[in-house]
Swiss-Prot record:
PANTHER family: UBIQUITIN-CONJUGATING ENZYME E2
Keywords in alphabetical order: Apoptosis, Cell membrane, Cytoplasm, Membrane, Protein transport, Transport
Membrane topology: Peripheral membrane protein
Region annotated Disordered, chain positions: 1-64, 273-292
Entries under SUPFAM superfamilies matching the protein: UBC-like (SSF54495)
Primary location group: cytoplasm
Species name: Xenopus tropicalis (Western clawed frog)
Gene Ontology process terms (BP): apoptotic process; early endosome to late endosome transport; endosome organization; endosome to lysosome transport; lysosome organization; protein transport
PROSITE patterns according to UniProt: UBC_2
Biological role: May function to promote vesicle trafficking and/or fusion. May also regulate apoptosis.
Entry protein name: AKT-interacting protein
Sequence ranges of Basic and acidic residues compositional bias: 14-23
Chain's gene name: aktip
Domain (UBC core): residue spans on this chain: 75-223
Length: 292
């Protein structure tokens, strides 16, 4: 037991009435009490309020990126906006994406394949981003119609993204890299640890049959190109057959803009010319006649 609570009352002195008036005098010290008279802590009343502050039953969870939990939604929105800006700046050939209207964690996209085994293929897909981005797993990419490919699940249509991004590293990996990877798989076939074993075996053993399967897959995907989106969203990518009334004017404006840009790039920068017109001699110039 703490010696403080064993302290006896030997230090307590008994003074008489006369001793209080006289500065000097005999003082009697009371004998120490028996051990049975030790000080005891008083019992805590049932309705007593503790002095210490109560511990919060559910402490606030701090995100791994060091951002306060209350800033989480704003930080996520800013991160996704920055990611989409990077996608636009990269100008990935044949790849187009559009964030969903209902959720910034879902992006709609389409890939146009212009050459190779999957030439003329138009593959629509959806990107699903984790809600704890960029500290979670890598985004998922799922094709609307499963493509016959070793790295695409033949049932769900999901691309094996983790093959290229085993661990998603914030500030190092970006969504545009996932889109570039999705485009690259159609030009460089990888058959190791496939999600579609049949496609991998055919590519290794019978290339002609693999090509035939790919052609059928491209035709199947293109046949569903005009279908309504599986997810109802105002920003979902929708294709419609060519309508001259609607599309001819837009096509002409696009071509005119492209032509003007090419012409502006071909113009020489204005400045001094060091070659006389009709002459091949450098630093030649026209002689101006001065009138007096």
């Amino acid at each position: 037991m703490n010696p403080f609570w064993n302290m006896s009352s030997a230090a307590v002195r008994k003074r008489s009435d006369n001793d209080e008036k006289i500065a000097t005098g005999d003082q009697k010290i009371s004998p120490p009490r028996s051990s049975s008279a030790k000080k005891q802590l008083p019992s805590i009343p049932k309705n007593a309020v503790p002095i210490t502050k109560p511990i919060s039953p559910s402490p606030s969870v701090q995100p791994t990126n060091g951002t306060h939990a209350s800033y989480g939604p704003f930080y996520l929105e800013y991160s996704l906006l920055a990611e989409f800006t990077l996608v636009v700046k990269q100008k990935l050939p044949g790849v187009y994406v559009q964030p969903s209207y209902r959720s910034a964690l879902m992006w709609f996209g389409v890939i146009f394949i212009r050459h190779g085994l999957y030439q003329d293929g138009v593959f629509k897909f959806t990107v699903y981003i984790p809600d704890n981005y960029p500290d979670g797993e890598c985004p998922r990419l799922v094709f609307d119609v499963p493509v016959f490919h070793p790295l695409v699940d033949p049932v769900s249509g999901e691309l094996d993204v983790k093959r290229a991004f085993t661990k998603w590293r914030r500030n190092h990996n970006h969504i545009w890299q996932v889109l570039m990877y999705a485009r690259r798989i159609f030009y460089k076939i990888d058959t190791t640890s496939p999600l579609n074993p049949e496609a991998a075996v055919l590519y290794e053993k019978d290339v002609q049959l693999f090509k035939s399967k790919v052609v059928d897959s491209v035709k199947l995907c293109n046949s569903h190109l005009f279908d309504q989106p599986k997810i109802e969203d105002p920003y979902a990518i929708i294709f419609s057959p060519w309508n001259p009334v609607l599309h001819d004017d837009a096509r002409e404006r696009m071509l005119a803009q492209k032509k003007s840009e090419e012409q502006s790039k071909g113009l020489h920068v204005s400045g001094l010319s060091w070659v006389k017109p009709g002459s091949v001699l450098p630093f030649s110039k026209e002689e101006n006649s001065l009138q007096t």
